Each structure stands twice: as C-alpha cells, then as structure tokens.
UniProtKB/Swiss-Prot annotation:
Top EC group: transferase
The enzyme's E.C. designation: 2.7.7.6
GO biological-process terms attached to the record: DNA-templated transcription
Entry similarity comment: Belongs to the RNA polymerase beta chain family.
UniProt GO MF annotations: DNA binding; DNA-directed RNA polymerase activity; ribonucleoside binding
Subunit: The RNAP catalytic core consists of 2 alpha, 1 beta, 1 beta' and 1 omega subunit. When a sigma factor is associated with the core the holoenzyme is formed, which can initiate transcription.
Organism: Pectobacterium atrosepticum (strain SCRI 1043 / ATCC BAA-672)
Gene: rpoB
Descriptive protein name: DNA-directed RNA polymerase subunit beta
Record's catalysed reaction(s): RNA(n) + a ribonucleoside 5'-triphosphate = RNA(n+1) + diphosphate
Signal peptide: none
Keywords: DNA-directed RNA polymerase, Nucleotidyltransferase, Transcription, Transferase
Function noted in UniProt: DNA-dependent RNA polymerase catalyzes the transcription of DNA into RNA using the four ribonucleoside triphosphates as substrates.
Keyword Phosphoprotein carried by entry: no
Pfam families: RNA_pol_Rpb2_1, RNA_pol_Rpb2_2, RNA_pol_Rpb2_3, RNA_pol_Rpb2_45, RNA_pol_Rpb2_6, RNA_pol_Rpb2_7
C-alpha cells in the first residue's frame, strides 16, 4: 500500500482480512447531490427549479389573449459568505432572477397571431444556498434538512388483517397514491361489495366511478366476468362447458354426455373428473331447466317486436323470465360465471347497491360527496371529476409513481402518463378482485421498495412550486384586468409568496432542524439521517410496531442499530455506510457480481425491489486467491430470508462487512460482540461526546475514523499537492506542484483556519495545523485538525487506563471512580463558548440606551465595562456581572413630594430610566473572548463599535496584504525562472528591484510571451486585491440590516473551561455509561507492580447482564497496543539503531493471519521511521473493522509482543494500604467519552425567586430559576413521620401563601422566628374553579 508523506506520520495497524473492493463513498453526497440537482440548470426540465418553472409556466389569461412564458433563470452571487452570515445572523442565500416573456395575441386575428412580445428579467426572491458541508445558514444558525422516508407514489394492495370487522373477516383494499393530487381507494366491505373513496371521504359503490367514466352496466359486467352461454332447445337447456370451471363444486345433477355419466349427482367434482371431461373433448352438456334459476344475466335482452326490455343486465334469472325470453325469440342466453371459490360475484353485487344509473347521476353523486351542500350542475360535476384524476395541473403520479404503478400491474413498459387512464382504474379493480379471489398477494408497505427517500432538493422544489402556484393565480388576474400594452413582466410577478414559501420551509419545517454540532460525528450523522416523520409522513402516535421494526430490506440500506431510544425509535434511522439513492429515490446498496462461481470486482447497485430476485452471499464468505468460493454451501440471502445455498447458485456477494451499519455504528470496535441494545446506546452516545482540549486518537478503532474526520469538513484538507511554504496558527500556505497548476496562475493555495468559534451546542470549534514548514503534501492530505480530530482521525474521547473491580462502593450501579490525575492532566477538560446578546430597541417611551451610566449600580459592578458600557475582551466574569449596560425609559409615574425634592436636587436622569443590563447567567463564569456590535443603518455608532470596526479593517487589510505578498512572491519566483532561462544573469537580476523585472525584454519570443503573460497576471492580482479590499471595507463600515425596531445588538462571547467533576456523565463506545461518583487522589488508586496507578475504576457487574463484551476485548487490545508503544518508547530512550526500530515496528504490523494491510517499512526513510516511532510511542493505534475484527488468538499474540500476560489480567495493589488485591484484575486501555450532560448545566439551587401568576407557587426548572416541587409522594412521607408543622410550612409559607410569605420575611427581619400560615392561593384557585362550574362553596369560620 502506498502512503503519502502525511499518512506516514502515523499508520493504524489494520486487523481486517477482507480486501476493500470499494472505497467508502463521500459521506455527505446524499445532501450535496440532491441540492445540486435542485439548483443546476437542467435542459431536460426533469428536476430542480427548471422543472418547477416548466410545470407552472406558461400562464395564460382567462380570455386566452395573452400569456406569460418562462425563458430561463439564473442564480446571482451571495452578498455575504458563510462566516459573515453566521456572525451577522442573516441567511446565506443567492438572488434568483428569472427571464420571462409576455406575449400578447391579436384579438380579432386568427389564433396565434402575435401582437406584442416583451421580455424582462424579474427578481423572484432569495434561494438559500447549501454550504460545502451540506448545511444551510438560516438567520445565522446552521441547519440541516433531514431526508424523509415516505410512501412511494403508485398503487398498493393491502388488507386490514381481519382487525376491522368483528367477525375477523379479512377485508382487502387498494390505494392509488399520486405524488400530487387526490388519493383513490378501493375497498371491500364485510358483505363483499366493492366501494371507492376519494381523499378518504365517505365511501361510494365502486361502480359509480366506472359509470362516471362512461361505462354502462353491461359493459361493467363484461369487463369483470367470464360468461356462460345457455341454449334453449325446445324444452331442453344446453350449456357450453368449460370443465376447469367446475373444479370444487358439487354436482346438483348427473353430468352426462353421449350416454356416459361422468359425474353422479351429489358427488364433489375433482381434478380427475375434469381431466376425463377434457380428454373426451366434452364441450356441451344438457342441464335441467331449474339449474339456470338464480343465475345473473350479463346483458340487456329486448323484445325485438315491441322494443320492450325483458331482462336487464345484472338481473337474476327466474323460470318465468326464461319462458319470456324464449317466447321473444332469444335462444342463446349469456349469464355471468361466478362461484364461491375463486370467481366471486362482487361487482355484480356492487352494481345492485349502486344508486346511480347513468353517467350524469354518477357524476352528481361524486360531486355531492366532494362538495356537500353545493347544488350540482352538469358542467361543475364534469369539471370536478375531470380535475380529480385526469388533469395534469391537479394530478401527477410522477415518474416514480408511474413506474411503481406499472410494475405492480405487471406491465412491460415503466414509463407513461402522469395522470390516470380508464385502463389504469379498471386494472387496479381487477387486481384487487383477483386478490380477494385468492390469486396474488398483498403488498408489504414496510418494504423499502415501497418507501422512497425525499431529500433536500426535491422538498425545496416542491415548496418552490407551491409558491409559484400562488403567484400563478395573481398573474392570471393581472393578465385579465390590466392594460396589457403598458404592463411589463416585472409588474405581474410579486416575489413575496415565493420567498415566503421557501423561507417557511427552510426556517420552520419539521424536517429543517437545528444542526447537532457536538462533534464531527454528530454533524455527519445528522446529515445522513432519514426520518419517517414530517409533512406527508407518519406521526409518532399513529406509527405502530411494524413501521418501526427492522425489515429484511434494510440490509445495506438503513442501519438496524442506530435509531433514537424513546418515542421516535424506528421512525428516525441512519443511512448505511455504502447506501445511496437511485434516480427514483429508492435506496440501493452495492454488491459484487459473481460469474461462474468467481467473485468479480464488478460493482452493481441494487434497490430493494431488484435485490429480491437474486441469491446474495455475505461479505465474510471464505474465498480462495482467485475469488472462488471455498465452501460447498454458502450462507446467502434470497427474497428476504437467510439460508444455505449451493455455491453455484450465488449471483452476488456483499461488498464489505460494514455494509449493513451506519457511520456511527461502524466506529464501534468489536461491535459483533455487543448486544444490539447496548450497541444502539453506544452509537447514539458517541454523538454526544464533547470535544476535549487535546484530542487523543483511539488506540482501538475500526479504520473508519479517517473517513469521518475528512468528510465531515471540520479539518482543512489539501485541494492540491505541493509543499508547505508557510504555517502559523491561523494560516497555512501551500506552494502547488507544477503539474497540478492551472495555466496562468500564481500556484499558491492559502488555507485560513477557524479559531475558537462557537458551535450550535456551545462547544468550541478550533483548527490546529498538523503539518510543518517544508513538508510535501498530496491532494486529500489533512493539513489542520479540527475539533475532535487527531492527525486527521476522529478522536471523540481519551484513552484511559481502566481496571474492572469494585472499589468501596464508589462504582455501585454504573458509577465511575476517576483518578485525580485525569483532572490534573486536563484529559477531559473542555471549552464551551456561550453567546450572550443584548438588544437595544426603540420603545414607545423612547429608545433604550447602551451606556455605562446605570442607575443604582456601584462602581465595582461597572469595573469591567468600558466607557460605552460594553465589557472588555479578556475580562474574567462570574454569575450576575454586568456585560453590557443598558437602560430603558420608564413611564411617567405620580411622584410623592419627597421624590420631587430628590429630583430637584439630584437631577432628572436617575429616576426615569430602569436598569435592563445584560448580565452573566447564574452559575456561569468564564472569560470574554469576543464582542460584536451591530448598529442599525442611520444610527450613530458608539466608540466601541468604531474601535471594533477599525480593528476589523486593520485585520482585513493585513490578511489581504499578506495574501498578496505570498502570491506576489510565488509569481516573482516564476518570473525569475523565466528571465534566467531567457539568458538574464541571476546575480544582476537579484540586484534589480522586483518591479523593474517586468520591464526587461527577452530575445526568445516564447519566453517574452511568457513574461508578458506573467506581467498581465501581476496587474490582475493587484487589481483583484484593490477590489477585495474595497468590498471588505464596504461590508465592515456599512450599517447592519437589523429587525424592525432594533437599534443596536451587542453580542458577547464567553468561554468557559470545564474540568471533569463528580456528576458528569461518561461513557465508552459499547453503551457502557455512568456518572462520576468521586475523584480519588492518585495515591489512593489501585496500582500495578510497576507502580503505575489506574485512571478509572469500573464496575465488573456492568458487563455480564448487559452482554457488551466488546468493551472487554477493547480493553485487552488497548493494553496490547499500549505495551507495544511502551516498548518503542524504551527503544527511543535508549537511542537504539533505526534498523532495530524498523524491524520491531515491522513485526508489529505483520502480526496476524492473512491481513489485507501490507505495510513495508523498507520503503520508509530513516527519518520517516523515526517520526513514525515518535507518534507510536504512546501506543500503536489499531483498527479492528466491524464484523471483520481481531481474533482472540491475534489479541493474545499482540499482548505477548507487548510483554503483557496473555490473560490480560494483572496483580493490583491497594493504593491506601499497599496490600495486594486477592485476585488478578482485568486492566487495559478503554476509549472513554465525556458526554454533553454536564453537572454544571444541571446543578441548580433557589432561595427566593419568581412565582406563577395564577397559583402563586414557585416556578419549576432551572431556566425559570424555579424551586423543587414538593409533590404528592413527598407529602405522604411527611404525613407518615407525623411532621405536621414541617408539612404546614411546606404547603403554605414556602409555597403559595402570599400573605404568610410576606409576614414570614418581616418576622425574620425582626428576629421573631414565628410563622403565621394563611390560606394557600391554590386553594382559592380551586374554589374559583368550582364556582365557575356553577357550584357555590363558601368557607365559614367555626
């Protein structure tokens, strides 16, 4: 395997055995590709904005004399970049401009004669843009649009499984779901009549819809039934015989022909009888006349001489009717063929209950059902029915819906019209009747072939279309009313409805969510999340167990492990690692093709529909070198079931062992040894890990860490290869390799790093360079680590030395005992950044003012504010400190004479304003790291705002100047090379000032041309610099666009450093979570024979019942990795020769059976080996991929190599007494995470505070500074103790006895410790409530 210079710094030893046939795909592609489809120009008009415009335009006026046509659209450039949008609190979006054409036709002239054409570009609102990382910045906050898993359009056949009717009879139904438009349901009732519902309204007999389509009763019967023909021959009756139709019936007479009795009366007709009849080619038999009674006519019979209707279609035959038919000359009589077995008379019965008789009455029935209370007219009824399913404006099955519809009805072609046809409706009814007759199966609605993904692009397109349709109505009216000669397209279009629809979707849709930004994994998982909730989806309350359950088709598409615990379980899922969506929006997963028993590297993506037809082997099937199956029988999946198949039957094979899990679950080592419930918790808790101060790569990983860190976008990744020319904390400059440069450019890439920025979850985002000056880098190398990444690998926690043993009850019930060393070394110290905002508004009484002159506040409280009343950067503040001084005007109040006197003496100011300053919340303390001031346009900026502005201008100029200097240096380097190669002496050239170089002329024409090109570039560079600087200056100095009524906003950023402490929640990656119970002195912790104390003591009882054995294996393997690291460290300390080091490290990499990873250290230089050794001395990182990890034998070998007992257990000594513990203890290294459930955020205490308005009881919760509820059960406890006075105090003065509270305060001040309880307010509330019900209750004194 070839490693780049950067990758050689630290190589993770991989225990994976299966070759990696397919690289991990880009993990955010589901978001980026979908949105790209939405905004890119699509000449076909199949999707995106183009499709939305084409579906609504052209808009014709009601008269048809004019129309507004769509020509094209373009998206402009966004005003602010992503960072500026986040700081200013605005949306990152681009203006949408649409070219429209207004065509006016001549009124009197023949159709299509154009009178006038006007074309104009119209502004149609702003479209939010996606950032490079798949998020949207809406009003300054990063949001993610979660993909939705919804029921695919098409036709579905289902049953109620016998739950609707008391008899337990199974009722079948069919539902046609369009992408847009009315739903059409067909359903059987318990009497086996077929009914139809439109949009889930009241049901009508299904034949109504057929009559509305223009079918008569006879035609309806002809569509759904086979016929039996009887011929009247004198007194005899003969029947055309189809032997197959007799199966299962009992003969009601002797069936004979040609004098031979085939079946005797009363006998059941079997397959043997049928074969006999077919063999003798019996096509006609004689039947008794009574046999025809009760049969149903299939068409109308008319007396030709009188024109009178004798027998109507669907009429039951009686012997009298038969005689009448015979007399009127009808000798051949057609009846419907029905039986109880597989040809039910359902449609015939339905026609009988149908109140309509012709097309008009059917249309009127449908109209009455859809628009109850409105008088129907023929036109209205026809228009309504036409618009329901046959109008392209109102109904659209979409390409997906048509494909699913045709597949379900077993048609050959999968394309067709978006609206329904007569045949479509009839075929659905026929299939439903077939299913009721026992032919065919109902669909499984939880099958992923019947559920599809709607991603950002598609949902945004739908919302945009909704906005356009609103505009369409207004345009139609304008075209009809206005004076068209003076109107322009601009006057027709109001962009508000479109902007509103788009804004509503991105801002407040259920699927537009505040991004989970705890760490890179939580970001990536949030973007790959798939929700069944949301508009057009399920609701939590209505979703049953089936929808939430894991389905066989989830394999390789949706993760069976990662889903939330609680009410959303199974409704919110995560995309599997390799899954992607196909053109129709169905999830597909890759497989390797198997040809003639050989597994090829040819990859096919199969959707759930296609997969069912194939036999697919698992990824861990044994193969020989040539890719042939070794075993005769192979475990495979087929039609959703797993079983053994012969190796010759296998058609596909899984791509990878981690194909079935999501990104989160694929990061859990030894996942295969964990119980699924705990794995679920482990996957979910990794997303809650807070980035620590110094990230520490996991010693035991799975090999997915690099992919997650790079794809999440938190690291800085090299766009092109080159050499590091400059590096500091905030910028990395790369001189690009010549072969990767574009013609005519400076060949310098500049990467500006993010420093100490606040994330959505208040954690800290900061990047640190991980390359040094002069290092070569290749495209895709990680240049700088972000939060929770270490040398380009995801690092959510810390490697801790753990021991599994009880310790004085401090690890009872999952508690965790932590050594003080962990706190001293800042292993789990995290930085949290809070944003506190102070808004100055224009009130009715006058503007609020931000000032340091605050009434009734002492000097000490103002010590950290500057003269503008805003806190200094760097100030250390604690709860209650003033950050921004603000005063609000007070209303005029009636003054007492004393107050008037005071006013007269001390001046006006102090009394007519009240203090409304921004203070630090209680319980928070930290350092101010940044202050931003936003001032409304037209409001004078205060001194602090001007200082900040000046500082920003200086910084911007400095950054741009440095950037220019770097680019200039690169450019002049190339100019120097051209001049020297053109014959100019280097010494003389170096003496000349650089600007003069461009004035030199060369004799070589090619070189001269090159020189001129470079000179042009230089001018362009300077021009570009001026332009950029001017744009920056304009952005910084201009006023801000603030909400109405807001004059000024001051944002203060407060950084809090939190060390780990008792009450914080920690967890491993295997669902093993707990709360810290005690931080123990280092000297009291258990230690080993070398005197090394352990960091964490865990309870061994947390393992067996939870069945997450993965944590034990991780501990052993971590110990082995650390042992090898220590051996390398010892060799480094003793300054061993590089050859010995190389040999030892090579042995470590080669350990294990047939590994896929081949590390050849002989290709590494001595310097590279030394650097690798330096990075390995704290432990050799190991990858054990999911379902393909290290075996027990390999772990033991590695332990042995690290000089650790193969049992993984060692003797420990008690730190307090020095005595040996009586048995050996499992000690090793486990990767522990600190979760975002910190005790500082939860700890809360209250003495007095705010009270509820109605009940006068203290409020609840930390946010309201509330009290602790003394509830019903607590009252019982005090009652049980007989503590009457304590109870009285709790229920009165400590709670809602208002007068008692005030008296109590007065008594305490007076030193009289008595209480006088009165009437609790909640009792008065109860009395009032009872009185409101009309029952008077009065309290009488005894």
């Amino acid at each position: 395997m070839v490693y780049s210079y950067t990758e050689k710094k630290r190589i993770r030893k991989d225990f994976g055995k299966r070759p990696q046939v397919l690289d991990i795909p880009y993990l955010l592609s589901i978001q980026l590709d979908s949105f790209q489809k939405f905004i890119e120009q699509d000449p076909e008009g199949q999707h995106g904005l183009e499709a939305a415009f084409r579906s609504v335009f052209p808009i014709k006026s009601y008269s048809g004399n004019s129309e507004l046509q769509y020509v094209s659209y373009r998206l402009g450039e966004p005003v602010f970049d992503v960072k500026e949008c986040q700081i200013r609190g605005v949306t990152f979006s681009a203006p949408l401009r649409v070219k429209l054409r207004l065509v006016i036709y001549e009124r009197e002239a023949p159709e299509g004669t154009v009178k006038d054409i006007k074309e104009q570009e119209v502004y149609m609102g702003e479209i939010p843009l996606m950032t490079d990382n798949g998020t949207f910045v809406i009003n300054g906050t990063e949001r993610v649009i979660v993909s939705q898993l919804h029921r695919s359009p098409g036709v579905f056949f289902d049953s109620d499984k016998g739950k609707t009717h008391s008899s337990g009879k199974v009722l079948y139904n069919a539902r046609i779901i369009p992408y847009r438009g009315s739903w059409l349901d067909f359903e059987f009732d318990p009497k086996d009549n077929l009914f139809v519902r439109i949009d889930r309204r009241r049901k009508l007999p299904a034949t109504i819809i057929l009559r509305a389509l223009g079918y008569s009763t006879a035609q309806i019967l002809d569509l759904f039934f086979d016929k039996i023909v009887y011929e009247i021959n004198g007194n005899k009756l003969q029947m055309d015989l189809v032997p197959e139709r007799l199966r299962g019936e009992t003969a009601s007479f002797d069936i004979e022909a040609n004098g031979k009795v085939y079946i005797e009366k009363g006998r059941r007709i079997t397959a043997r009888h049928i074969r006999q009849l077919e063999k003798d080619s019996i096509e006609r038999i004689e039947v008794p006349v009574e046999y025809i009674a009760g049969k149903v006519l299939s068409k109308d019979y008319i007396d030709e001489s009188t024109g009178e209707l004798i027998g109507a279609a669907n009429m039951e035959l009686s012997l009298d009717l038969l005689a009448k038919l015979s007399q009127s000359g009808h000798k051949r009589i057609e009846t419907l063929f029905t039986n109880d077995l597989d040809h039910g008379a359902y449609m015939s019965e339905t026609v009988r209950v149908d109140p309509s008789s012709d097309r008009l009455s059917a249309l009127v029935e449908i109209y009455r059902m859809m628009r109850p209370g409105e008088p129907p007219t023929r036109e209205a009824a026809e228009t309504l029915f036409e618009n329901l399913f046959f109008s392209e404006d109102r109904y659209d099955l979409s390409a997906v819906g048509r494909m699913k519809f045709n597949r379900s009805l077993l048609r050959d072609e999968i394309e067709g019209s978006g609206i329904l046809s007569k045949d479509d409706i009839i075929e659905v009814m026929k299939k439903l009747i077939d299913i009721r007759n026992g032919k065919g199966e109902v669909d499984d609605i939880d099958h992923l072939g019947n559920r599809r993904i709607r991603s950002v692009g598609e949902m945004a397109e739908n919302q945009f279309r909704v906005g356009l349709v609103r505009v369409e109505r207004a345009v139609k009216e304008r075209l009809s009313l206005g004076d068209l000669d003076t109107l322009m397209p601009q006057d027709m279009i109001n962009a508000k409805p479109i902007s509103a629809a788009v804004k509503e979707f991105f801002g407040s849709s259920q699927l537009s969510q505040f991004m989970d930004q705890n760490n890179p994994l939580s970001e990536i998982t949030h973007k790959r999340r798939i929700s069944a909730l949301g508009p057009g989806g399920l609701t939590r309350e209505r979703a049953g167990f089936e929808v939430r359950d894991v389905h066989p088709t989830h394999y390789g598409r949706v993760c069976p492990i990662e889903t939330p615990e609680g009410p959303n379980i199974g409704l919110i899922n995560s995309l599997s690692v390799y899954a992607q969506t196909n053109e129709y929006g169905f999830l597909e997963t890759p497989y390797r093709r198997v040809r003639e028993n050989v597994v090829t590297d040819e990859i096919h993506y199969l959707s759930a529909i296609e997969e069912g037809n194939f036999v697919i082997a698992q990824a861990n099937t044994n193969l020989d070198e040539e890719g042939r199956f070794i075993d005769e029988l192979v475990t495979c999946r087929n039609k959703g079931e797993s079983s053994l198949f012969s190796r010759d039957q296998v058609e596909y094979m899984d791509v990878s062992t981690q194909q079935i899990v999501s990104v989160g679950a694929s990061l859990i080592p030894f996942l295969e040894h964990d119980d699924a419930n705990r794995a679920l918790m482990g996957a979910n808790m990794q997303r809650q890990a807070v980035p620590t101060l110094r990230a520490d790569k996991p010693l035991v990983g799975t090999g997915m860490e690099r992919a997650v860190a790079v794809d999440s976008g938190v690291t800085a990744v090299a766009k092109r290869g080159g050499t590091v020319q400059y590096v500091d904390a905030s910028r990395i400059v790369i001189r690009v390799n010549d072969d990767e440069m574009y013609p005519g450019e400076a060949g310098i890439d500049i990467y500006n790093l993010t420093k100490y920025t606040r994330s959505n979850q208040n954690t800290c985002i900061s990047q640190m360079p991980c390359v040094s000056l002069g290092e070569p880098v290749e495209r895709g190398d990680v240049l700088a680590d972000g939060p929770s990444t270490d040398l380009g690998e995801l690092a959510l926690g810390q490697n801790m030395r753990v021991a599994f043993m009880p310790w004085n009850g401090y690890n009872f019930e999952d508690s965790i005992l932590v050594s003080e060393r962990v706190v001293q070394e800042d292993r789990f110290t995290t930085i949290h950044i809070q944003e506190l905002a102070c808004v100055s508004r224009d009130t009715k009484l006058g503007p609020e003012e931000i000032t340091a002159d605050i009434p009734n506040v002492g000097e000490a409280a103002l010590s950290k504010l500057d003269e503008s009343g805003i806190v200094y950067i760097g100030a250390e503040v604690t709860g209650g400190d003033i950050l921004v001084g603000k005063v609000t005007p007070k209303g005029e109040t009636q003054l007492t004479p004393e107050e008037k006197l005071l006013r007269a003496i001390f001046g006006e100011k102090a009394s007519d304003v009240k203090d409304s300053s921004l203070r630090v919340p209680n319980g928070v303390s930290g350092t101010i790291i940044d202050v931003q001031v936003f001032t409304r346009d037209g409001v004078e900026k205060d001194k602090r705002a001007l200082e900040i502005e000046e500082m920003q201008l200086k910084q911007a100029k400095k950054d741009l100047t440095e950037e220019l200097q770097i680019l200039e240096a690169g450019l002049f380097g190339r100019i120097h090379a051209v001049l020297v190669s053109g014959g100019v002496e280097a010494d003389k050239l170096d003496k000349l000032p650089r600007e003069r170089w461009l004035e030199l002329g060369l004799t070589d024409e090619d070189k001269q041309n090159q020189l001129e090109q470079l000179a042009e570039q230089y001018d362009e560079l300077k021009h570009e610099f001026e332009k950029k600087l001017e744009a920056k200056r304009r952005k910084i100095t201009q006023g801000d666009d603030l909400a109405p009524g807001v004059l000024k906003i001051v944002k203060v950023y407060l950084a809090v450093k939190r060390q780990i402490q008792p009450g914080d929640k920690m967890a491993g990656r295997h669902g093993n979570k707990g709360v810290i119970s005690k931080i123990n002195p280092i000297e009291d912790m258990p230690y080993d024979e070398n005197g090394t104390p352990v960091d964490i003591v865990l309870n061994p009882l947390g393992v067996p019942s939870r069945m997450n054995i993965g944590q034990i294996l991780e501990t052993h393997l971590g110990m082995a990795a650390k042992g090898i690291g220590e051996k390398i460290n010892a060799m480094l300390k003793q300054h061993e020769e590089v050859t010995k080091l190389r040999e030892f490290i090579q042995r470590a990499y080669d350990l294990g059976d047939d590994l896929r990873q081949k590390v050849d250290l002989s290709t590494f230089s001595d310097e590279e080996v030394m650097r690798l050794a330096e990075n390995l001395k704290k432990g050799m990182p190991i990858a054990t991929p999911v379902f393909d990890g290290a075996k027990e034998k390999e772990i033991k070998e590695l332990l042995q190599m690290g000089g650790i007992p193969t049992s993984g257990q060692i003797t420990l000594y008690d730190g307090r007494t020095g005595e040996q513990f009586e048995r050996q203890v499992t000690v090793g290294y486990m990767y522990m995470l600190k979760l975002n459930h910190l005790v500082d955020d939860k700890m809360h205490a209250r003495s007095t505070g705010s009270y509820s308005l109605v009940t006068q009881q203290p409020l609840g919760g930390k946010a309201q500074f509330g009290g602790q509820r003394f509830g019903e059960m607590e009252v019982w406890a005090l009652e049980a103790y007989g503590a009457a006075y304590t109870l009285q105090e709790m229920l009165t003065v400590k709670s809602d006895d208002v007068n008692g509270r005030t008296k109590m305060y007065k008594n305490i001040v007076d030193g009289n410790h008595q209480m006088e309880p009165g009437m609790p307010e909640s009792f008065n509330v109860l009395l009032k409530e009872i009185r409101s019900l009309g029952i008077n209750i009065e309290l009488e004194e005894k």
